[in-house]
């Protein structure tokens, strides 16, 4: 769904992704559409790398943020859809990650995301301080800054994101938090 394309009816299952700067990314500009995506039975392990790489150690990053490159080959289409990413099911994910799982939109541009049966284990990072405590939402012009507390889930600008049956392991003796801002209908 990068830039303005349309992606529908995607199924990702039974995958192992190890030592990745970002494991699972679903992204679209607000003028694209990504819908009806299921990802299940995944083992995701990330680490943040120094340098200018997309991703900042996120095991899951779903982002529907406006970005348009003036030199992109196609003009911005006029679409009627309110949400550019919708109807996503993430099920049976085992995540070992240096950063939070993230669902980031603008004004509800990401909606109806359900995560079920998650295991999340945060781990120490040598390089997270290089980019800062942020979710990498490149190429969007804005940022997604994390709270100072250990954070396992970051939601912003989304609608109807639900999490059920999640186990989040303690990190340095603390229970990581779930952070939500402008997240209508979020339940976790």
Predicted regions and their residues:
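Extracellular/periplasmic carbohydrate-active domains that bind, remodel
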Residues: 1-188
């Amino acid at each position: 769904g990068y830039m303005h394309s349309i992606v529908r009816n995607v199924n990702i299952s039974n995958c192992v992704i190890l030592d990745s700067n970002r494991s699972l990314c679903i992204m679209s500009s607000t003028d694209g559409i990504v819908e009806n995506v299921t990802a299940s039975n995944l083992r995701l392990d990330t680490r943040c790398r120094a340098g200018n790489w997309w991703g900042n150690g996120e095991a899951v990053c779903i982002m529907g943020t406006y970005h348009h490159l003036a030199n992109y080959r196609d003009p911005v289409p006029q679409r009627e859809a309110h949400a550019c990413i919708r109807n996503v099911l993430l099920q049976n994910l085992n995540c070992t990650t240096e950063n939070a799982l993230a669902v980031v939109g603008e004004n509800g541009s990401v909606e109806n995301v359900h995560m079920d049966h998650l295991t999340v284990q945060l781990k120490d990072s040598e390089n997270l301080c290089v980019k800062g405590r942020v979710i990498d939402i490149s190429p969007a012009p804005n940022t997604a800054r994390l709270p100072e507390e250990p954070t396992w889930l970051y939601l912003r600008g989304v609608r109807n994101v639900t999490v059920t049956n999640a186990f989040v392991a303690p990190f340095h003796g603390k229970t990581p938090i779930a952070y939500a801002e402008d997240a209508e209908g979020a339940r976790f």
